[in-house]
């Protein structure tokens, strides 16, 4: 099996397991409905999993959410080790995913410049339907 393919499969499976574990986590400060693990990146030796977290809320709430998740990383690692057959369960490290926020800013800048990619896409689709 291609090592890159296996790594991608493991990252995807870890992401699914983390979402399951999040639902079982008992922390009243955590607003589970607004937390999403946008991506997981395994290190080459598969000992570390960097998990990027998207969260709807203020910057302070996002920072607090990442801190709460990092304090509970032992719980997440144990959950993964019980549900995934690996020699060593990876150490989990949570980070705020700023990619979505950055893409929204880029979109806003494009709109300010007079270019709206969403409207252009809709217009192209309408033109295709007319043909």
Curated annotation (Swiss-Prot):
**What positions belong to coiled-coil segments?**
none
* Main localization of the protein described in the UniProt heading: cytoplasm
**What's a GO biological-process term for it?**
maturation of SSU-rRNA
**GO MF entries:** ribosomal small subunit binding
Query: What is the annotated localization of this protein?
Result: Cytoplasm
Q: Which InterPro entries match?
A: KH_dom-like_a/b (IPR015946), RbfA (IPR000238), RbfA_dom_sf (IPR023799), Ribosome-bd_factorA_CS (IPR020053)
SUPFAM superfamilies this protein is in? Ribosome-binding factor A, RbfA
Superkingdom of the source? Bacteria
Alphabetized, the UniProt keywords read:
Cytoplasm, Ribosome biogenesis
GO CC terms on record?
cytosol
Q: How the protein assembles, per its UniProt entry? A: Monomer. Binds 30S ribosomal subunits, but not 50S ribosomal subunits or 70S ribosomes.
Q: Which PANTHER family match?
A: RIBOSOME-BINDING FACTOR A, CHLOROPLASTIC-RELATED
What function does the entry list? One of several proteins that assist in the late maturation steps of the functional core of the 30S ribosomal subunit. Associates with free 30S ribosomal subunits (but not with 30S subunits that are part of 70S ribosomes or polysomes). Required for efficient processing of 16S rRNA. May interact with the 5'-terminal helix region of 16S rRNA.
Q: Which family does it belong to?
A: Belongs to the RbfA family.
| Protein name as it appears in the record | Ribosome-binding factor A
Protein source organism: Thermotoga petrophila (strain ATCC BAA-488 / DSM 13995 / JCM 10881 / RKU-1)
């Amino acid at each position: 099996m291609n090592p890159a393919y296996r790594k991608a499969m493991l990252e995807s499976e870890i992401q699914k397991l983390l979402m399951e574990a999040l639902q079982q986590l008992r922390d009243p400060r955590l607003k589970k409905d607004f937390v999403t693990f946008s991506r997981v990146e395994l290190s080459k030796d598969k000992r570390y999993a960097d998990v990027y977290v998207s969260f709807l809320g203020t910057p302070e709430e996002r920072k607090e959410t990442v801190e709460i998740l990092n304090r509970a990383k032992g719980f997440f690692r144990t959950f993964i080790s019980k549900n995934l057959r690996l020699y060593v369960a990876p150490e989990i490290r949570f980070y705020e995913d700023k990619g979505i926020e950055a893409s929204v800013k880029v979109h806003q800048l494009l709109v300010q410049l007079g270019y709206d990619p969403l409207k252009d896409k809709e217009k192209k689709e309408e033109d295709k339907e007319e043909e």
